[in-house]
Each structure stands twice: as C-alpha cells, then as structure tokens.
Amino acid sequence: MAINGRYFVQFRRRREGRTDYYQRQRLIVSGRNRMVVRKTNRHIIIQLIAAQMDGDYTLVHVNSRELVNFGYKGYLGNTPAAYLTGMLFAVRAQKAGYEGGIADIGLQVASTGARVFAAIKGAVDAGFDVPVGEAILPDDDRCNGAHIAEYDERFAGLVENVEATKDAIMKELE
C-alpha cells in the first residue's frame, strides 16, 4: 500500500513476476500479431494474439494435446512435440488467413535449442513467417526425436512416428 508520494506500487502482474511490460510494449509497438509460445511440464501451448486497445484477442490456439489426433504416440512436452505443435499452429494460422507474426516467449529463458524455439522452428518450416535467428533454433535431429531414440531403445520408432505425424499435419493444410 502506498504510504506517501515517493512510494510506487508496481502492477500486479509485474509484482507476481508474470509479465515483463517493457518487452510486451516493444512487441505490441511492432504492429504485428504475436506468436505466443508457452510451455508447461506436460504440454506446449501456442497462440496467435492480436493486441487491441480493449484487450488482447486470441486468433489461433493450438495445444500439444491435439497431436494425438494426428497419430503422435510420444510424450507431449518434449522437443519433437513442440516442433510438431509449431507445425500444426502454422497450418491452422495459414488456413485462418494469417501469414506471420513475431515470436513472444514471455519470461522463459532464451537458450539455444530450447523447446520454445523448437515450436518456432516447426512454424517456420511449415511456412509461417516469424523473424528468428537460425543459430538459436534446434537442429533437425532434436526436432525429429533422434536424440531420444538414441538414448533408449524403447523409443526406437519415435523418429518414424514424428515423420508420420508431420505428414498428417501437412495434409490438413491441403
């Protein structure tokens, strides 16, 4: 609570550590729709958000849980699932008439090859225009699950499953 004029109460979402308003302002001033990528422990969530004066509007929403409908049998929170979710997002966004956006990873740490960048790479590979540097994106072996299949023989068919799911997602674009 403010006691005198020298005390400044921060916005609630800033106090909770949920929003970086400086970053949000720079993204909104760009004038482009935001491709918002969020990760949980079990899923990847991608949304296309348009900022308006009366609030933000969700234009396209994709959750990695939807990959099961395309035949994906792997874990829904790993790098291949993030890549496939990004592809599914790009297909749905293009069908809705949106060609591009600007990446918004929020307060997540931007480390090379992270799941959020796998999702962005999936969207870029499916034809969605997102300005991103190639150096921070994960390589193709991580996106198709080769590192997981190499680690444990129980996941030997993961690479083929990722490729089959990728083909099923791209068929939705047609």
Swiss-Prot record:
UniProt keywords, alphabetically: Ribonucleoprotein, Ribosomal protein, RNA-binding, rRNA-binding
Superkingdom, taxonomy of origin: Archaea
Biological process annotations from GO: ribosomal large subunit assembly; translation
Keyword RNA-binding on entry: yes
UniProt GO cellular component terms: cytosolic large ribosomal subunit
Single Gene Ontology MF annotation: 5S rRNA binding
Function, as annotated: This is one of the proteins that bind and probably mediate the attachment of the 5S RNA into the large ribosomal subunit, where it forms part of the central protuberance.
Annotated family: Belongs to the universal ribosomal protein uL18 family.
Protein name according to UniProt: Large ribosomal subunit protein uL18
